[in-house]
Regions:
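A detector of single, family-specific signature residues
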Residues: 1-259
Length: 259
């Protein structure tokens, strides 16, 4: 039974909302429903993909929480460090922030040692010239930084622990995403969705996981309504409102497609 359809069919002029009244309305609605066949049993792959997508989104939310906490702590232990790299949450940026959680830790070591730390902070290729450039920038930031706490504060230790948690979460999420992509590639229409400009392999796997078996939709209109991007139009007399989408469908699927 479609919940929205049931709501329309059981609505009345008099508003009376109780659990007992709802059960009575649904019981009265039952005999009027047409007999339908059993719902198709989706293959295990769609269930697995959906659960993987939901877990991916949970981990992303947890990572966003960690990022917010890390940035707040950095403003107290090492203000300005977030300016060193364009991507403040890249692996190299997190590695540097984990090693140098306080400006005194930068100023107390030799320049060559600092360059070596930066050079070894990424698995990707980095030239020694670029590492030297980052080392000089880091020294300038450390000299201009005025932290709220000293290097022995608990906040320094807390920051380091949160960075370690975020790095582990990023590593685990990458492994889970690779497995999800491999699972989704078993479907014959994976490449069809992946061929759409702007949709990568991970997005393709997550879209399939959230929507399910796309072949069960008989038309694009049904798919649009399921996602909630079908058009909502309002016109009354000389009033013509701008068309909007209904947003009654799967909000997670909408986020994957347009977020």
């Amino acid at each position: 039974m479609n919940p929205l359809e049931a709501k329309f069919k059981t609505s009345a002029l008099r508003s009376w909302k109780t659990d007992q009244a709802d059960a009575h309305k649904l019981a009265c609605l039952g005999p009027t429903l047409k007999q339908t066949g059993n719902l198709p049993i989706h293959e295990l792959i769609f269930f697995e993909l959906r659960e993987r997508v939901r877990f991916h989104l949970e981990i992303e939310n947890e990572q966003n929480r960690l990022k917010f906490q890390i940035l707040e702590l950095l403003h107290q232990t090492f203000p300005g460090l977030e300016r060193l790299f364009s991507s403040r949450y890249s692996i190299i940026a997190l590695n540097i922030a984990e090693i140098f959680t306080h400006p005194d830790m930068v100023l107390d070591i030799d320049k060559d040692v600092l360059i070596t730390h930066i050079f070894n902070s990424t698995d990707k290729g980095m030239s020694m010239d670029k590492a030297t450039k980052y080392a000089l920038q880091l020294r300038v930031i450390a000299q201009e930084s005025y932290p709220n706490v000293d290097r022995h504060s608990f906040l320094v230790e807390k920051l380091r622990l949160l960075i370690q948690q975020l790095k582990q979460s990023i590593h685990h999420l990458k492994q889970l995403d690779d497995a999800m992509i491999q699972l989704a590639q078993q479907l014959d229409y994976f490449e069809n969705i992946h061929s759409i400009p702007g949709i990568g392999k991970l997005s393709t796997a997550m879209i399939i996981g959230e929507i399910g078996d796309i072949k069960r939709f008989k038309s694009n209109k049904q798919l649009n309504a399921f996602v909630g991007i079908d058009i909502k139009r309002y016109q009354s007399g000389h009033t013509h409102c701008r068309d909007t989408i209904n947003k009654r469908g799967n909000k997670k699927a909408r986020k994957l497609l347009f977020g």
